[in-house]
Amino acid sequence: MACPIRVAVTQAEPVYLDLAASVKKACGLIAEAAQNGAKLVAFSECWLPGYPAWIWARPVDFELQTRYIYNSLPIESEAMELVKATAKEHSIAVALGFSEQSPSHSIYISQAIISPQGEVVMHRRKIKPTHMERTLFGDGSGADLNNVVEVDFGAEHGKIKVGCFACWEHTQPLLKYHSISQGEAIHISMWPPIDPSAGVDHPGLWSMTADGCQNLSQTYAIESTAYVLHSTSVCTQKGIETLKTQDGLSCRQPGGGHSCVIGPDGRRLTAPLGDGSPDAEGIVYADLDLTKVVATRGFLDIVGHYSRPDLLWLGVDREQKENIIAKQHKAAEQEAVQG
């Protein structure tokens, strides 16, 4: 049996709408996590260059939208190379949440898992952006269903299956079932800054609050019997002023940070950072005993002994759908067959 593996979950504010400064801060957090013994560090949804919370305050903002696109991260870029190099230098895996800029300047809610060797071993886009997110972000495609990858942590810990989802993907039963079928042992649950509930008169949905979102992460842990790294970010008063969200449903007040680690039976394993204030910045650490994943699956394995595929099953199309598909002429097709 491999020894316990230390993981790190960030609870930090990006430099909103500033990709270069946010990447610099991310690299500092990666180094800090590694120096404290972590072998995997998780960031929150769209941490680069920050979650665009103004979408929950007003229907459109051309100025901020344009600025956001320019500061979103292309997967092939110097900024991504810097993050990869930092992971390799410190021999730590990184689960990165970012706004991805495509060559045509469309943007997507994306996630990447970078190995301790500095390679992007998994890159995916959120299958369906949530509600107002669709005013900015495009959809994922079939290949983005592959959200779990085996990460090589070296001789001490071996290869471990790590997966991730963004935010309300944790409400999607079919998507979750497909993810769980891939056998992850560690799951990164990425969220934006999330506000506490104001009670029965809360202006939004309880499922969008800190308690509601943690509930979804804990439910995923129970269903998957995997450890869940519940990663959230922070929005200070400076962030509110940058995003102009003081009158919105999200980031109305400083806070948003509720990061924690959840066990494979759904229990919360870590205390809040500092004094528990949601505007506290830092890193949450936990040492994971992966034998507890196996022990829990002895009771509950919804893609194994606790399933009935003869009665209920899931169909999946993992093909990537492209905008341009070259038509192959009949002569070329015949030549290919004859060859």
From Swiss-Prot:
Domain CN hydrolase: 5-290
Alphabetical UniProt keywords: Hydrolase
Species annotation: Fusarium vanettenii (strain ATCC MYA-4622 / CBS 123669 / FGSC 9596 / NRRL 45880 / 77-13-4)
Variation of activity with pH: Optimum pH is 5.5-8.5.
GO-annotated molecular function: arylacetonitrilase activity; hydro-lyase activity
UniProt protein name: Arylacetonitrilase
Function statement: Nitrilase that hydrolyzes preferentially phenylacetonitrile, (R,S)-mandelonitrile, and 3-indolylacetonitrile.
Residue numbers annotated as active site: 45 (proton acceptor), 126, 167 (nucleophile)
Temperature dependence: Optimum temperature is 40 degrees Celsius.
Source species, domain of life: Eukaryota
Reaction catalysis annotation: a nitrile + 2 H2O = a carboxylate + NH4(+); 4-chlorophenylacetonitrile + 2 H2O = 4-chlorophenylacetate + NH4(+)
Hydrolase keyword on record: yes
Family under the similarity heading: Belongs to the carbon-nitrogen hydrolase superfamily. Nitrilase family.
Keyword Hydrolase tagged: yes
